[in-house]
Design a protein with these regions (language model features):
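Asp-based phosphoryl-transfer active-site loop
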Residues: 2-18
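Substrate-recognition "cap/lid" segment bordering the active-site pocket of phosphatases
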Residues: 48-102
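N-terminal hydrophobic or amphipathic helices/low-complexity stretches enriched
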Residues: 297-362
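A non-catalytic alpha/beta surface segment that caps or lines the substrate-entry region
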Residues: 336, 343-403, 560-562
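Catalytic-core environment of secreted peptidases
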Residues: 337-351, 375, 379, 396-480, ...
């Protein structure tokens, strides 16, 4: 009989770590029913809670609290790193059976690859555990929704069978993982499915390609739908050809899963660095890592987004709030935070250590997380870390909340804490060009997104000061700093997925991504509300953008505010707000004048380069403070202050 081993983070549960190190495991959707369907089968754990006995004890306590009694055999519980086959070999030995009788269930493709090396069968999601036991393959599938069907009907079918969505391209197309059994259920319900390659040890990415496409003259007189299909097919082929050429020396390689919104879906084998590929002529943020999530079909935030529109009442923010923000969110405050996390000043006062890089692969990333979490704690906020794994790295998003009793939802003020220097020029000891090495190369990220992170911290300090003076918001306010944004929105996708699974009531998300770059000319800030997700999320995000624009008029009257909306917004899917759009919540991203769209860009010229420092000529903390004040006033107004 088979022995089942499960990873915890993102597979069985979403993991959060409190300030005292205690852990909470929130079971992922459909997980408990899967475990209970194998009640008579031996089950174990292969997971890495972090170094030290205390971390393992905390993880064991959280496991029992979340899944009481379902993992009773301690001999089958294995804590430790999953960066080689060693821990998987140990699991097979503990099972006392053949390796082929052992199944490892884990979302991370690299870990599944190590499990395969140890002779284990694997499943990319708990829903496919039985398929792994029975030796049935799981495929990538493009599911088409006909005009007489909708996503809610597809969800009803998928949640009862072996189907898990990873991306909703539109109301008519969903990319999913599915077995042949799941596909039969889908097709019997009136949907169609186009099977692509097997999932095995691959993960899915959306790679956008903004280069112009010339549709053949033969389509000149064709219906608009036919021309659009031809253009999408050609764009997908061009994008995949470029990615394949860039990764030609890698083994194994990637495969195309067909056209995606603005580009191509790609299945990348374990270890393949798709996120490092940059297509010339393509706007920034063109790669998304896609995660399996049943909530992509239900979009639980839609009701809240719809209510946001109905409840939104235009009006100027209170003068008291404006004054408080002006006093706390200052150029000097922004500069001080940026200096600490970009290496211009020591990270922590009294400690000479400075930050070289906040890249997700850099050792400094965790140090910055520690420092930011510590500052939030000093402000009296409830702090926890949302833990996740990316390419063998244990990473954390940082969350800090001022909770309000009987709150009508929570307002999120967000940015991403990581950085990259991938667009820089690097040379080896002989002076020959070499690729960016995220482990050792500098990535100060003063603008991207040190400026947004600084603005979040300054807003938290402002709220703390307001509360100390006797004011209290009507809604809870939560500050979230996402990790691994530069790897395809990985941290925010993991966070938003967890929020959807736990029924988080999010009133609105205000993301700041690059707010300090200014070359001169007209002071302009961009408010990005656009999304390809249809339904209430579009209206809710537009209304949230209106609120930000009104705040800008109050605290940054010398700025031109550029509101971008709809599918034509150049930031669609390219910053962390998109992870919330996917699940139906109203969200905006506010930035410097970064995109060349209706007016020439005046933002930083050091994007993703080691020159993105506090001393860069384009880095303007006065400019950043004005944008930060705008978002702070909007957020605090939404919170009822």
């Amino acid at each position: 009989m088979s022995v089942l081993f499960f990873d915890i983070g993102a597979t069985l549960a979403d993991v959060s770590v409190a300030a005292d190190g205690s852990m909470t495991f929130d079971p992922r959707p459909r997980v408990v029913e899967v475990l209970d369907s194998f009640a008579q089968v031996r089950k174990g754990i292969i997971s890495n809670p972090g170094p030290g006995a205390t971390a393992r004890e905390n993880a064991a306590a959280a496991l029992e609290a979340a899944f009481g009694g379902r993992f009773a055999d301690e001999a089958l519980v294995h804590w430790g790193a999953k960066d080689s086959r060693a821990i998987f070999d140990g699991a097979v030995t503990s099972a006392g059976t053949e390796s082929d009788d052992c199944v490892f269930v884990g979302e991370d493709p690299d870990e599944r690859a190590f499990a395969r090396e140890a002779g284990m069968r694997t499943a990319a999601h708990p829903v496919f555990t039985l398929a792994a036991v029975e030796g049935r393959p799981v495929h990538w599938a493009r599911i088409e929704v006909p005009e007489d069907r909708n996503l809610a009907e597809l969800e009803a079918v998928a949640n009862l069978d072996e189907v898990v969505p990873v991306h909703v391209a539109s109301d008519r197309l969903v990319l999913a993982m599915a077995t042949a059994r799941g596909v039969r259920a889908v097709e019997q319900s009136g949907f169609t499915a186009d099977l692509r390659g097997q999932v095995e040890e691959t993960s899915a990415f959306l790679v956008r390609d903004d280069r112009p496409v010339s549709v053949p003259e033969a389509f000149a007189q064709a219906p608009a739908v036919s021309r659009a299909t031809a253009e999408a097919t050609m764009r997908a082929a061009a994008a995949f050809a470029f990615v394949s050429a860039e990764l030609a020396e890698s083994r194994p390689t990637a495969s195309s899963l067909g056209p995606a919104p603005g580009g191509v879906y790609i299945a990348a084998a374990a270890g393949l660095p798709v996120e490092n590929v940059h297509i010339p002529g393509t706007r920034p943020g063109h790669i998304e890592r896609l995660l399996p999530d049943p909530a992509l079909l239900s979009r639980p935030g839609q009701a809240r987004a719809e209510g946001f529109v109905a409840a939104f009442a235009p009006g100027a923010p209170s003068q008291e709030t404006v004054d408080a923000v002006r006093a706390a969110v200052t150029p000097s405050a922004i500069r001080a935070h940026v200096a600490r996390i970009s290496g211009a000043d020591p990270l922590v006062e009294g400690d000479p250590l400075t930050v070289r890089s906040r890249d997700a692969s850099s050792a400094d990333n965790e140090r910055v997380v520690d420092a930011l979490a510590g500052r939030f704690q000093e402000l009296g906020l409830a702090v926890r870390r949302h833990a996740f794994t990316w390419r063998g790295h244990r990473l954390s998003n940082v969350e800090a909340e001022l909770a309000v009793g009987a709150s009508d939802g929570v307002v999120l003020v967000t940015a991403h804490l990581d950085s990259t220097g991938a667009e820089g020029e690097f040379f080896d000891s002989a002076g020959r060009p070499r690729p960016y090495d995220p482990v050792v190369d500098p990535a100060p990220g003063a603008d991207d997104d040190g400026s947004g992170t600084a603005a979040v911290m300054a807003t938290a300090e402002c709220l703390s000061s307001m509360v100390a003076s006797g004011r209290s918001p009507a809604r809870s306010v939560r500050f979230v700093l996402f990790n691994a944004e530069e790897q395809g929105l990985v941290g925010s996708k993991a966070y938003a997925r967890a929020a959807a699974a736990t029924g988080d009531d999010i009133a609105g998300v205000l993301q700041m991504d690059m707010i300090a770059g200014f070359r001169g000319g007209t002071r302009t800030m961009e408010i990005h509300a656009g999304s390809v997700v249809p339904g209430p999320v579009a209206g809710g995000s537009d209304a949230l953008a209106d609120l930000v624009a009104q705040a800008g008029a109050a605290v940054a009257p010398d700025f031109t505010v550029q509101q971008l909306t709809g599918a034509a917004d150049p930031a669609v899917g390219r910053s962390d707000h998109a992870s919330f759009h996917e699940r139906g919540w109203a969200a905006v991203a506010v930035s410097e004048n970064f995109f060349d769209d209706t007016r020439p860009a005046t933002g930083t010229r050091q994007y993703h380069r080691p020159g993105d420092t506090l001393l860069d000529i384009d880095h303007d903390t006065d400019y950043a403070a004005s944008v930060a004040r705008t978002v702070a006033v909007a957020a605090l107004t939404l919170a009822g202050l």
